[in-house]
């Protein structure tokens, strides 16, 4: 199934995110009336968001509110604060649930047996890349990071099959990273992708894909400063697992 939302489905998802506290109490008919969309649109949107249906989505929200987050000491908390907390909670929980253990194991092995590990990242994702660089170096791994677009493209053409590359990209469409990934793909260089976009171009070129959940809305819509929380979660799990594995050896 194509997970890309249509214009109407995107409108609905934005409506849901802006009314996230009320949604658990809505029926599908009421949501249809409030958002002025058909029930069929609601069902399609839920499917694309990897839910079985609207009831499944509501169940997830209720579970998150009643079990994972305790608001009992914040009875009068501002709705905006609650919405922000729930949005972050959703990114954490769904990212963890989406991770495939087999891919994490493959990534650990790829890093372990590489002579050198290169981390490529741009923009806000550079912060995640920097953390990965430091932690890999602390385990004794020969690792380096590059953020300059021209250097990234140049180095990607000089790697050997004994190297591995980690691409860190929220949307997986950054041009210089795509170019570098294609170079690695053509030269059969091992690659790992940390992203939050299931259908990205980078995903097509990378050998091992670790994909997290990214909420659609942004509280800073005029700027490219979207949350990298899903990438942070993936990076931490991968690096913690790698460090534990190296400690066992």
Regions found by a protein language model. Give the residues of each.
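Short, Lys/Arg-enriched N-terminal segment that forms or immediately precedes the first helix
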Residues: 1-2
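HTH-adjacent hinge/linker in prokaryotic transcriptional regulators
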Residues: 5-8, 18-25, 33-39, 45-105
């Amino acid at each position: 199934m194509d997970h890309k939302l249509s214009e109407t489905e995107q409108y609905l998802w934005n409506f849901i995110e802006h009314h996230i506290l009320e949604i658990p109490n809505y029926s599908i008919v009421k949501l249809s009336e409030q958002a002025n969309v058909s029930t069929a649109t609601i069902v399609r949107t839920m499917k694309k968001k990897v839910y079985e249906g609207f009831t499944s989505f509501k169940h997830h929200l209720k579970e998150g509110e009643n079990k994972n987050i305790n608001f009992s000491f914040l009875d009068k908390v501002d709705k905006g604060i609650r919405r922000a907390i729930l949005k972050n909670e959703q990114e954490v929980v769904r990212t963890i649930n989406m991770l495939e253990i087999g891919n994490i194991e493959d990534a650990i092995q790829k890093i372990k047996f590489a002579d050198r590990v290169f981390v490529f990242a741009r923009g806000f994702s550079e912060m995640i890349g920097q953390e990965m660089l430091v932690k890999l170096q602390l385990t004794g791994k020969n690792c380096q990071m590059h953020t300059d677009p021209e250097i990234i493209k140049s180095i990607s053409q000089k790697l050997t099959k004994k190297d591995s590359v980690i691409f860190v990209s929220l949307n997986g469409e950054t041009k210089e990273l795509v170019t570098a990934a294609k170079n690695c793909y053509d030269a059969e260089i091992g690659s790992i992708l940390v992203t939050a976009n299931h259908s990205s171009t980078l995903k097509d070129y990378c050998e091992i894909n670790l994909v997290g959940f990214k909420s659609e809305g942004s509280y800073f819509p005029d700027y490219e400063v979207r949350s990298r929380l899903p990438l942070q979660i993936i990076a931490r799990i991968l690096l913690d697992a790698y460090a534990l594995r190296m400690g066992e050896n």
